[in-house]
């Protein structure tokens, strides 16, 4: 991540106060980014988004239109955020009452969150997890989990390529060739 990258695109109708924007990042119309936010390389921040100060966005992240990312949200590399995803940062909000600290929400590497989902403060979306559209996430979602609903519940597991995994004797082989194991409620990729 460079400081005030010369190779990023900022639409003339965007307000970008931060100098911490990576190379080849595109920021479209009516986006407002506050001064302390950090945005990595090759990101795409679509129209009508707001990004607060205590926000980190990694490399190769897609932020679709209508998303507000509040203080305390940390987004790792290769994450997809569908249109109008909602992040909260205060579990017990009141007007003009400010918490000493905001809940920390982490979206891990390769995760995808479907359109109009709500991510309640303080939760972790695991690596390559997939949250279905319109879901309300009220607890952590583990790596590779496919979760959806209100509240979001684990309905299965997906490969990095997004294909649904079918476990037999706690092992799965995806059509793309990647192998996984399931043990003690945790899915992990087998490197062979």
Curated annotation (Swiss-Prot):
Upper classification of the organism: Bacteria, Bacillati, Bacillota, Bacilli, Bacillales
Gene from which this protein is expressed: fdtC
Designated name of the protein: dTDP-3-amino-3,6-dideoxy-alpha-D-galactopyranose 3-N-acetyltransferase
Keywords: Transferase
EC top class, as a word: transferase
Catalytic function, reaction form: dTDP-3-amino-3,6-dideoxy-alpha-D-galactopyranose + acetyl-CoA = dTDP-3-acetamido-3,6-dideoxy-alpha-D-galactopyranose + CoA + H(+)
EC number: 2.3.1.197
Protein family membership: Belongs to the transferase hexapeptide repeat family.
Source taxon at top rank: Bacteria
Keyword Transferase attributed: yes
Organism the protein comes from: Aneurinibacillus thermoaerophilus
Molecular-function GO term, any one: transferase activity
Cited function: Catalyzes the transfer of an acetyl group to dTDP-D-Fucp3N to form dTDP-D-Fucp3NAc in the biosynthesis of dTDP-3-acetamido-3,6-dideoxy-alpha-D-galactose, a glycan chain of the S-layer.
């Amino acid at each position: 991540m460079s400081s005030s990258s010369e190779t990023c695109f900022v639409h003339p109708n965007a307000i970008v106060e931060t100098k911490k924007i990576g190379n080849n990042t595109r920021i479209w119309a009516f986006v407002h980014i506050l001064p302390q936010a950090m945005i990595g390389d090759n990101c795409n921040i679509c129209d009508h988004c707001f990004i607060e100060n205590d926000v980190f966005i990694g490399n190769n992240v897609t932020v679709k239109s209508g998303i507000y990312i509040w203080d305390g949200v940390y987004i790792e590399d290769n994450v997809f955020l569908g249109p109008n995803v909602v992040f909260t940062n205060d579990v017990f909000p009141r007007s003009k009452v400010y918490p000493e600290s905001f809940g920390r929400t982490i979206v891990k590497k390769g995760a995808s969150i479907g359109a109009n989902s709500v991510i309640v403060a303080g939760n972790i979306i695991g690596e390559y997890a997939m949250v279905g559209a319109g879901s309300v996430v009220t607890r952590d979602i583990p790596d590779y989990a496919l979760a959806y609903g209100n509240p979001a519940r684990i309905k299965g597991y997906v490969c990095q390529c997004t294909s649904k995994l079918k476990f037999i004797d706690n092992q799965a082989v995806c059509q793309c060739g990647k192998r996984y194991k399931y043990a003690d409620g945790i899915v992990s990729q087998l490197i062979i």
